[in-house]
From Swiss-Prot:
Any one annotated GO CC term: cytoplasm
Official protein name in the record: NH(3)-dependent NAD(+) synthetase
Family that this chain belongs to: Belongs to the NAD synthetase family.
Subunit structure and binding partners: Homodimer.
Pfam families hit by this protein: NAD_synthase (PF02540)
Positions bound to deamido-NAD(+): R147, K180, D187, H267, K268
Amino acid sequence: MHAVQRQIAEQLKVQPPFADQNALQAEVARRVSFIKECLQNARLKTLVLGISGGVDSLTAGLLAQRAVKELRASTGDNSYRFIAVRLPYVVQADEHEAQASVDFIEPDERHTINIGSSVKALAAEVKAFDGLPASSVDFVLGNTKARMRMVAQYTVAGAYQGLVIGTDHAAEAVMGFFTKFGDGACDLAPLSGLVKNQVRAIARHFGAPESLVEKVPTADLEDLSPGKPDEASHGVTYAEIDAFLHGEPVREEAFKIICETYAKTQHKRELPYAP
């Protein structure tokens, strides 16, 4: 393992590869316990998570639903619940997969909040967009969509006195592939430290359909590049990112891209700067 790989892995608290099925099951149990502890320590009984249709929110949702089921069983308190929230922007191209994901999770409640009108209303009021290239406006509004989705989730959590779950994991964190104060905002991040193939392995452990487990990851935030794969944005594959984080050799160009991207996105992984 290169020294830089070791340093980054330590900073992101990357978990080692699952040695076998027992190790995977133990990790699932540990993360479910973590969710339960967070909820009980906050003296709250509701978990809220936006479900996009991707494997990350699918896996986080499965962990959350198991956590509240176990809390109901162990405490006899049936008020513990998990709320899955669909947050489409107008019409989502892969809505069928998103609904299939929610169906498989079987949350206690499901809500749908369309963020389209809110994002468009805000965009209409921003004079700074005047004269900007369409691509620049599209990029900014992509981040606005992510932030509006988090506003919606925290609004639901506030109404039901709950905690918001995030889906960030090590393979996204190392690339800074999240919107600051958007999908990067949450109260607890149960996938933290996992690489992408471990997230998929946990989804499989729950019996999730391969069509959802292996669905091409996409943030799908930009109107001019609908459904753009994450890997096209990264310039490297998730397999290469996973290998890098686990200290395995990767091609020279991938190593360079990951290290440079990690350095320039450091501000996204830190608290606001202060004097």
